[in-house]
Amino acid sequence: VKADLPKKQKGAVAIEFAMVFIIFFAVFYALVSYSVPLLMVQSFNKATAEAVRRSVALDPATPGYDAALIARAKNTLREQLTWIPQAFNFNANNASDATVTYAGGLLTVRVHYSTDKLRQVIPFLVLPGLGSVPALPANLSAQSSLQF
């Protein structure tokens, strides 16, 4: 003989499941939606630091040193960020995504990626009382500098 739950208990189980599912989904969505921007920012930090680090190896006696230094930093930045898929619309050659400057002996490598581009890949939820999830700044950015 199979023992079955009374109807009142079946309804309680359904309500409990609905509440647990909402909490589970919220945690899962937050984990997924925040991990991609965090991964990108860490990659930007590593790429800018590596671009500056590799530029140090360039001989200052090289003809056209300033241009060669900027070119080396840009190439390194591009190499380090090749893993970013095309869907993210990131272009290290584009001045709106990355800049390399050398002025007064200061080499600065910057990456600034618009969150609007990220919205094309990750769906942002707008929750009443909380706002947009994930809550991100207007730009994901990183910068490394070195005084020569």
Where are the language model's segments positioned?
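Short, conserved structural patches
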Residues: 41, 50-148
